[in-house]
Amino acid sequence: MARSGLSEPPGRVAATSTHPRPTLRPGDTTVSTTPQDDTATTPLWRPDPARAATTTIAAFQQWAARHHGAPAEPLAPLADDPDGSLAAARYAALHAWSVADLDRFWTAVTGWFDVRFTTPPRGVLADPAMPGARWFPGARLNYAEHALRHADTAPDAPAILHLDETTTDPRPLSWAELRRQVGSLAAELRRLGIRPGDRVSAYLPNIPEAVVALLASAAVGAVWTSCAPDFGARSVLDRFQQIEPAVLFAVDGYRYGGKDHDRTEVVAELRRELPGLRAVVHVPVLGTPAPDGALRWDDLTGHPVARPEFEQLPFDHPLWVLYSSGTTGLPKAIVQSQGGILVEHLKQAGLHLDLGPQDRFLWYTSTGWMMWNFLVAGLLTGSTVVTYDGSPGHPGTGALWSVAARSGATVLGTSAAYVIACRKAGLHPGRDLDLSAVRCIGTTGSPLPPDGFRWIYDEVKHDVWLASVSGGTDVCSCFVGGVPTLPVHLGEIQAPCLGADVQSWDAAGKPVIGQVGELVVTQPLPSMPTGFWNDPEGTRYRESYFETFPGVWRHGDWITVTPRGTVVIHGRSDSTLNRQGVRMGSADIYEVVERLPEIRESLVIGLEEPGGGYWMPLFVVLSEGARLDDALRGRIRTVLRDQLSPRHVPDEVIAVPGIPHTLTGKRIEVPVKRLLAGAALDQAVNPGSVDDLGTLRFFEQLARERAADRTG
């Protein structure tokens, strides 16, 4: 996977940060709103030193120390480092080097992972200013070429294992067959007139055909974009009409929750409303024949092409367009580059998840979520990617654990919400299934609460590395996440990722430790957007990330960087709770409230009222058979007061029939706040961005009733 003996190319000029690094000074206070117990300083898990020494990141550090000036310190024996503080200091030194000397660090990454520049770069970071940083000027390469190069060394090994709700055993697709299908499809795309810069769209589930189509698109230099087939026509058109695709790959339907879902009418509407389409390719998941005028998948991928032709492209050539949730307007069409994604995903998958040819990489996702794009990155490291098309909770809540067992997954990724659902269902996957192959469990989507950490170690596996991560569609990667050589502490993400100059800033732009602040990134990352589609002046891009702190990426999350270097995510800062001048994270409230067995899900909103008042209601979805009476309201208030603070106690607790989510499953807070403030539904939210628009009707009606009470 990696190569050694590479020396640093000449002419690199180190980039240094102009922003201060946060350090703990005498007099600093440590304040955390995340519940911790008295054993918080004792790790839940420590990697065995022998295991840590064999990780890719450990080998990378030693190699980078010899060739690129990285700090080198040997791993401490377990007995000499009971709390993991020495390991943390070792990683902190590596991280500090990675952000203080961006040129050397990213040169080391490209050397270690043998990135193949057909035209070498003239430098690393030509312009570090954000927005607009320019990486590896003059370089030419191809993402798909790197994703398929393991076909040379392991042609018969599985590149993809696929499962769905109807299969017991995974269906393999070998590296050689994956490369052949990509080559055949890429040749057909060229025959259709697709050239670099043309857009290729997909309305596909998480199936091998989607991976083939993405890689074929990248091979010819087209710009990929995708939506999951559970998106309705309006949601898809809000995205695809922005970029005007020339090709649409589309399924006839999908299977979820034990049911077939026909999408032929949706696909017909997409064809009518996307006038720039030159071709529609039919992928028959449900086995229906291709509609009139559509091309058949098998006809395009059946040619005996030995090796694809890879277009050699500038480093910043667009690879794909991802989309924001679009809850309050048209989704942002986020453009990321071939080279930027390649080097960032090699770093993230290869170093932070420690993926290699020995691994089977399963992350539960859909093609409408950035984690699908990141799942494909497993191919870059030679890992076998496991695709699963179906519900994680069918036929029972623990279905995803069964998929992991049947596929032999070594790295399993899921959402924090799924972990909590399994805990509430009383599952024991470690007892009931063979999960011996699983060495790492990743979680993302929302902060994983301490109870989720405990449940994984109690009920899944006591010796497993739990990599809670946080990043965003905006960079298709993680800002903070897992490190295989570090301990895991209750309720905390292990560390900032290499090359990511993550800090927590107060309102004055001062770095803080042990206090809640804004998540900022003070230096560029290669996978940051090259821009937004149809934003030629970059106005919307700047407004999205760089208005609060000019030249610094503000991500929109509240975080605490702890004195030991771990990170706690408190929720979105754009839905801030602010009582009596104290900022609070909604995630902390959800974690405490949803421990109660009577509460299935919750939503908290802070609303400034006329006359200077502040109203903070807590909305709860009750578990089956539960009743919101005075006793339960009292218990909710008591646990919030005792485990957080009196400020976290809501003004009212209100039962609701459901909580609204984005199409990728995240709670919607800002549109609910707008509704409660009196905005009309069509002004508060983009209807096509919500999983169940009916859940918002309750809040709309509540706002009317409150307005009537005030005027009455």
Annotate the PLM regions.
Residues 3, 11-12, 21-25, 31, ...:
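Structural core segment of the AMP-binding/adenylate-forming
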Residues 94-97, 144, 160-215, 232-237, ...:
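Conserved AMP-binding/adenylate-forming core of the ANL superfamily
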Residues 156-158, 282, 293-323, 330, ...:
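Conserved pre-ATP/AMP-binding loop-to-beta segment of ANL
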Residues 202, 227-252, 267, 393, ...:
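AMP-binding/adenylate-forming catalytic core of the ANL superfamily
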Residues 205, 247-266, 287, 389-393, ...:
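Adenylate-forming
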Residues 279, 603-609, 617-621, 637-712:
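Conserved C-terminal "lid"/linker of ANL adenylate-forming enzymes
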Residues 342-360, 370-411, 425-427:
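Conserved AMP-binding/adenylation subdomain of ANL enzymes
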Residues 439-566, 572-576, 589:
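Conserved AMP-binding/adenylate-forming
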